[in-house]
Design a protein with these regions (language model features):
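Conserved ABC ATPase "signature" region
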Residues: 14, 29-47
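Catalytic Walker B motif of ABC-type/P-loop ATPase nucleotide-binding domains
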Residues: 76-79
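Short loop immediately C-terminal to the Walker-B catalytic DE motif
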Residues: 82-83
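H-loop/switch region of ABC-family ATPase nucleotide-binding domains
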Residues: 112-113
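Conserved beta-strand-loop-alpha-helix hinge in the C-terminal portion
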Residues: 130-154
Length: 155
């Protein structure tokens, strides 16, 4: 979404349903409910009529996550979803993403350079560096014990 795009939060979120619409020019009641539910999950319902470009970075991330929820109900692929956010908003976003995974059963595949967060929230780690690793957190820490010693960075 371009930052200058003059769409409301609700319109941006509804655009996630376009893959379900086919050639219909309007959204169905079910799609509108799906968007409303996604706004509720992301705790942004009061922002529904606001212009996307006037939102803070954290609010914009929540809008885009709500839009993604309208597009899929099974898996989210997130690329650095907390990039540029302050620590408080980062913690809130990770908590929302974790809730989607635990309570809604949505598989979350997330690209992150924040190894501490990955180790806190992920069930499995794919590490691509000088060596490649895929496995559980426990197996990762056995393979890379220096992670905790270096404050969450593995070489």
């Amino acid at each position: 979404v371009q930052k200058d795009f003059p769409a409301s939060v609700r319109e941006i979120i509804l655009s996630g349903c376009q893959g379900h619409c086919g050639s219909r020019p309007f959204y169905s009641k079910e799609e509108k409910k799906l968007a409303a539910d996604a706004m509720e999950k992301m705790q942004i319902t009061p922002l529904a009529k606001r212009c996307y470009r006037t939102l803070s970075g954290g609010q914009q991330q929540r809008v885009l996550l709500a839009r993604a929820l309208c597009a899929t109900r099974k898996m989210l692929l997130l690329d650095e979803p907390v990039s540029g956010l302050d620590p408080k908003v980062t913690a809130e976003m990770y908590a929302l993403i974790q809730k989607l995974n635990y309570e809604d059963g949505i598989t979350v595949v997330m690209i992150s350079h924040d190894l501490n967060a990955a180790l806190q929230y992920a069930s499995h780690i794919l590490h691509i560096g000088d060596t490649v690793f895929f496995g559980s957190k426990a197996a990762y820490l056995n393979e890379f014990p220096q992670v905790w010693q270096k404050g969450g960075t593995a070489q």
